[in-house]
């Protein structure tokens, strides 16, 4: 991937692979290992070398990679995204029913509920399996349609097209075939284990459709999980293009649980990045003063997609700042500080994009629409570095199938690559020196 041209097809493969946060993390880890990054389990002692390339995972659903500085620590570059997407979590394997094979689910994140109806679904996640030495995780995702969530037909619900209010407990429970089916047995066979050895599991429903180009000229693409695996992959690509500097460390991180508040151990409010920074600094003999100075001379990208102006509902977007798919990377602002971008950090990122030849669009909500939040301001509590919130415009965010721009994906990759190759220094508060 390093020194290779950005490929939209490789992004598609990443989107297709990321059927759960565990699968997204495994896919990213495989890319890192192929690029020579060494796995450092959190439970092991780390032996870190100047200029070394490493990565670690937490809970199997978050991953952080880094390049060690080659000299005295002077600052950090980092890009953060998330591995999870809205879906349905399976509460238990099998539920008693007189007619159908069923399993109870509950909503994970703020999905568009109707988008999950009447489409072929599979099950993805991890099994926790008993072994002779203890417990192991096994990823599973059968490559076939295992389930669907059936709509109530229009004949039994004449108001269906007049604004249906869905009750997840009643209207959105999946079926897994006829009576007598056993989901646990099917997943055990998929993983090559005995059903009685499965002690627990973290499982979700996943769409079966693959990422595909869309549009008369193929300029758009559709896929599940574009939010936020598009940013995860494009920032990873940019990270891998980084040359590194004598005193700067480079970090790429993909957290879990952003869609439900980031408050888990593996989320942005957890200590993953702070813990890794502390271990790196300790291995380098960095003093508290050096640490504070280096963090001041840093810039962190919080990369999470935003809303493109909808073709049928342009009134939902800020009229002064329309977002066009294919119009470039989003620079996200919010007066309530749900986005971390300030004029100071926004200026630095804009300058970097200009050098890369990447267009920038301002993303802001209407003054009467509060909008969503992301992981940047939550991560900021842990690491205390200057940050900027960025993303890419997309349609149908949190739908089972979303839509985005092929050109924008390449814009993000180019911008992030330029960022990792641009020296950044803050000689005094409110002033940047950029190696442009």
Regions found by a protein language model. Give the residues of each.
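N-terminal hydrophobic/helix-forming segments and targeting peptides
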Residues: 1-436
């Amino acid at each position: 991937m390093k020194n290779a041209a950005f490929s939209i097809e490789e992004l598609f493969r990443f989107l297709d692979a990321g059927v759960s946060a565990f699968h997204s993390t495994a896919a990213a880890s495989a890319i890192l290992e192929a690029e020579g990054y060494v796995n450092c389990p959190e439970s092991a002692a780390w032996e870190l070398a100047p200029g070394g390339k490493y990565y670690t995972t937490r809970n199997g659903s978050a991953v952080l990679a880094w390049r060690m500085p080659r000299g005295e620590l002077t600052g950090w570059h980092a890009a953060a995204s998330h591995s999870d997407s809205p879906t349905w979590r399976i509460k238990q394997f099998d539920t008693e029913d007189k007619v159908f094979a069923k399993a109870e689910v509950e909503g994970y994140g703020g999905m568009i509920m109707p988008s999950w109806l009447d489409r072929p679904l599979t099950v993805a996640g991890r099994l926790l399996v008993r072994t002779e030495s203890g417990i192991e995780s096994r990823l599973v995702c059968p490559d076939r349609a295992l389930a669907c969530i059936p709509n109530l037909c229009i004949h039994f619900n004449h108001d269906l097209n007049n604004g249906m209010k869905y009750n997840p407990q009643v209207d959105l429970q999946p079926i897994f075939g006829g009576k007598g089916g056993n989901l646990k047995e099917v997943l055990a066979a998929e993983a090559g284990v005995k059903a009685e050895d499965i002690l627990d599991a973290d499982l979700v429903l996943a769409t079966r459709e693959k990422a595909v180009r869309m549009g008369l000229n193929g300029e758009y693409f559709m896929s599940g999980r574009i939010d936020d695996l598009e940013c995860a992959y494009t920032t990873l690509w940019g990270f891998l293009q980084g040359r590194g500097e004598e005193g700067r460390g480079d970090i790429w991180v993909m957290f879990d649980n952003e869609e439900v508040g980031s408050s888990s151990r593996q989320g942005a409010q957890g200590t993953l990045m702070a813990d890794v920074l502390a271990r790196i600094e300790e291995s380098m003999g960095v003093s508290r003063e050096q640490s504070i100075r280096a963090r001041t001379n840093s810039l962190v990208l919080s990369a999470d997609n935003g809303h493109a102006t909808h073709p049928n509902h342009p009134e939902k977007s800020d009229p002064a700042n329309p977002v066009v798919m294919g119009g470039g990377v989003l620079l996200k602002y919010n007066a309530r500080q749900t986005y971390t971008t300030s004029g100071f950090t926004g200026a630095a990122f804009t300058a970097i994009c200009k050098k890369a030849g990447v267009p920038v669009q301002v993303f802001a909500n209407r003054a009467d629409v509060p909008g969503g939040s992301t992981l940047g301001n939550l991560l900021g509590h842990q690491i205390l570095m200057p940050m900027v919130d960025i993303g890419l415009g997309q349609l149908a965010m949190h739908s089972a199938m979303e839509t985005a721009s092929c050109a924008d994906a390449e814009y993000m990759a180019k911008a992030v690559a330029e960022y990792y190759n641009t020296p950044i220094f803050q000689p005094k508060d409110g002033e940047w020196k950029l190696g442009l």
